[in-house]
Amino acid sequence: MSGPGGANDIIARTVQRVIQQRKLVDAPLAIVSKVGAGGVLGWSYLNQHAGDGGYISISPINLLTEHILGASPLTYTDVTPIAQLFNEYVAFVVRADSPLRSGRDILDKLRSDSGALSFAVAASLGGANHIAAVLAMKNAGIDVKKLKFVVFTSGVQSQTAVMGGHVDVAAVPVSGVVPQVEAGRLRVLAVSSAQRLGGAFASVPTWKEQGVGSVFSSWRGVIGPKGMSAPQVAYWENVMARVVESDDWKKDIATNFWESNFMTSAESRKFLQAQYAEYKSVLIEVGLAR
C-alpha cells in the first residue's frame, strides 16, 4: 500500500516483527510493497491470490475513499476483512506565532467567512486529513464547500508550508508533528480524538471540548484476498488478537499516539460498512463524489 518507510509499510513491518519474535505463525513472513494508484495496485495484487490464506495486507481508509471517489474498482466488499488494529488521530496545527490560539478561533474566523483560512492536507482531497478537517468544520455549521484546501504530497510538506506562512492551518497525523511542536515551531489547536491524548498532546483540547461534536480517526486494519475460508479468517484473526496483546505492540501504540481498537472479522465488516456510508456522505457534500 505504501513504499518502504511509508506509514503502512512501517505498520506492516511492526506486525511482522511482533509475529516473528513471538513465533505466532509457523512460516516466515515477507513484506511485498505494491505502490501506486492510491492502494489499488496492492489490493489488486492481493486478489490475484483469491482464497489463499498466505496473503494479507494492511488496510487504511483509502480502501473505502478511493472507491467512493471513483478511483478504485475495489472496496471492503471485494476483499476479506480480518481485523481492525488501531485508530490514528489528526492534529490541527498552526505556526507558533499565529494569531489563531485555539480551535474556537479557527471556527470563529470561518463562521464569518468560510474561505478566510487555508488548510494544508496530504496527500489528496478525499484522504484522511482532508476528511478530518471537513467533518470538524461541517459539525461546526461551516459551509464546507467554500473551505480552502492546499494539497501536499506529505505531512512534512504540510507542516513546512504552515511554518513558512504559506498556509494557515495543517491537518496532519498526530505522531508526525511531535518534533516541530517540541521545538516550538508549531502549536496544536485541536485533535480529532474523543478524549485528550497524552504526552506532548496532554494540554491540547479535542474538538468536542471546543464545542464541535466531531471525532475522526485514520484507522488501520488487516484484510485478506476475496474468497478466504472461515478457518483461514479465524487463523489470522487469532494471530492479530495476539499481536495487539503483546508488550512490543503496546509500546509502539504509545510511542505513536495511536489508540488500540481491535475488532474481529465480523466486527470489522460492520465497521467498514458504517465508515463507507459516513465518508460517502462527506465527500458528496464537498462535491468529490456522487
Name the predicted role of every residue range.
Residues 230-290:
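An extracytoplasmic/periplasmic, membrane-proximal ligand-sensing/linker region
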Residues 35, 116, 121-124, 128-203:
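Ligand-binding pocket segment of bilobal, Venus flytrap-like solute-binding proteins
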Residues 176-247, 274-277:
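C-terminal lobe and pocket-closing loops
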Residues 7-11, 15, 38-42, 61, ...:
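Stable alpha-helical elements in mature extracytoplasmic
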Residues 19, 23, 33, 50, ...:
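Sec/Tat-exported extracytoplasmic proteins
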Residues 1-78, 125, 142-168, 262-263, ...:
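N-terminal (or domain-start) structured segment
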Residues 3-5, 61, 95-100, 122-127, ...:
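Short coil/turn segments
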